A protein has these predicted regions:
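Solenoid-like repeat scaffolds
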Residues: 8-14, 46-52, 84-90, 119-127, ...
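N-terminal leader/linker segments that initiate helical-solenoid repeat arrays
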Residues: 1-81, 90-96, 303, 309
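C-terminal soluble interaction/assembly domains
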Residues: 243-246, 250-314
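Residue at a conserved register position within TPR or TPR-like alpha-solenoid repeats
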Residues: 29, 67, 105, 140, ...
Length: 314
C-alpha cells in the first residue's frame, strides 16, 4: 500500500452483483471517450438502491476523471468530492482521489477548500512526502499566509537542497512574506552550488541584490551570467544594466555608471541608454566620448533628440 500508516481501515472494495453490468457499461463509455455518457451513468448508478459504497465511489471517481477530461474542473471537483464522501474505495484509490480533489480546488483558486482537503489528506494518511508538503505550502501562499508557507519551504529546502522547483517556490513565498533577505540567502546558496542555470533564476538573484542595494554583487551575477551564456544580450538585460548604471550614478560612482551604460547601450531597444551614457560622460569631462555616444543615441532613436543635439553642439 502507498499509505501504510493511514488511520482509515481500507474497506473490502467489491462491486455489488446487481451493479456490475452498469459499471462495465460505464467503463466501455470511458474507453470510447464518451465523457458525458460516463457522467450520466455515474449519476444513475449513484441513485440505485442496490449500489454499495464501492459502486458509488468508483462511479463518481470515474465521472470526476471524465469531467476533468472535458476541462470542466468545477464538475470534476464535485464528483471527486462525492467519491471521497462515498468512502468505498481502497486506501490507495481513496487518497489518490482526495489528493486530486485538493489539486483541482487549488487550480480553481478555492484555496480554503484546498487547504481543508490537503489537511485532511495529511492527517489521515500520516504521509509527509516533500511534494505533498510543498503543495500545502503553495495553498497557504494562495491564502496569503506567506509566513507559514515560507516556514514549510525553508524546512523542505534544508532536507532537499538540490530540488530547484522547491527552491524557486520557496523564494516566491519568502518574497510574498516580505522576507527579502531570507529569499536572497536561499538564492545565494543555490547560486554558489551552481543550481541557477536559467535567466529568470539569475534575474531573481540579481534583482534581489539590487533591491537590497548590494550593487557589486548584482553586477558580478550579471557579468557571470553573460560570460556563461545564460543571460543573452537584449532589451531586458539592457534594462537591468541601466538600473545598475543609474544606481552607480546616484551613489557618485561615475566609472561604474559609465561601464554599465556602455554595456546596456548596444543591446537596448532604443537610444536612451546611449543618451544617458553621453550625459554621464559629459559630466565626467569626457567630451569626445560624450559626443560619440550622443550621435549613437540619435541614430538609434530617442524621445528628446534636442538633449543629444545639445551635447553635440558643445
Amino acid at each position: 500500500p502507498m499509505y501504510p500508516n493511514a488511520t482509515r481501515q481500507s474497506p473490502e472494495a467489491k462491486a455489488s452483483p446487481k451493479t456490475i453490468k452498469s459499471l462495465q457499461a460505464m467503463q466501455e463509455l470511458y474507453e470510447k471517450d464518451d465523457w458525458a455518457g460516463v457522467i450520466s451513468k455515474a449519476d444513475e448508478l449513484g441513485g440505485m438502491a442496490s449500489a454499495n459504497a464501492y459502486d458509488k465511489a468508483f462511479a463518481y471517481s470515474m465521472a470526476g476523471n471524465a469531467a476533468a477530461n472535458m476541462n470542466d474542473q468545477a464538475k470534476a471537483a464535485t464528483y471527486f468530492g462525492k467519491a471521497v464522501d462515498a468512502n468505498g474505495l481502497d486506501n490507495d484509490s481513496h487518497y489518490a482521489t482526495m489528493y486530486n480533489l485538493a489539486i483541482i480546488q487549488y487550480g480553481e483558486e478555492k484555496y480554503a477548500d484546498a487547504l481543508a482537503t490537503i489537511d485532511r489528506f495529511l492527517a489521515e494518511t500520516k504521509s509527509g512526502k516533500a511534494d505533498q508538503l510543498a503543495f500545502r505550502a503553495g495553498v497557504l501562499a494562495g491564502l496569503n499566509r506567506n509566513d507559514e508557507a515560507a516556514a514549510i519551504y525553508k524546512d523542505l529546502i534544508n532536507k532537499n537542497p538540490t530540488d530547484k522547483r522547491l527552491l524557486m517556490n520557496g523564494v516566491a513565498a519568502l518574497q510574498g512574506a516580505e522576507k527579502f533577505d531570507d529569499a536572497n540567502k536561499l538564492l545565494e546558496q543555490a547560486y554558489q552550488r551552481g543550481m541557477l542555470t536559467e535567466p529568470r533564476e539569475l534575474r531573481a538573484l540579481y534583482i534581489g541584490y539590487m533591491n537590497a542595494q548590494r550593487w557589486t554583487e548584482a553586477q558580478k551575477v550579471v557579468d557571470d551570467g553573460v560570460a556563461k551564456g545564460i543571460l543573452q544580450p537584449g532589451p531586458e538585460l539592457a534594462r537591468d544594466y541601466q538600473i545598475l548604471a543609474q544606481t552607480a550614478y546616484a551613489n557618485d560612482n561615475m566609472p561604474l555608471a559609465i561601464a554599465m551604460y556602455k554595456r546596456a547601450a548596444p543591446m537596448a531597444a532604443d537610444g536612451e541608454a546611449y543618451l544617458n551614457l553621453a550625459k554621464v560622460l559629459d559630466m565626467d569631462g569626457k567630451k569626445a566620448e560624450a559626443k560619440a555616444a550622443a550621435k549613437s543615441a540619435l541614430d538609434k532613436g530617442i524621445k528628446k533628440p534636442e538633449d543629444a543635439k545639445r551635447i553635440l553642439a558643445r
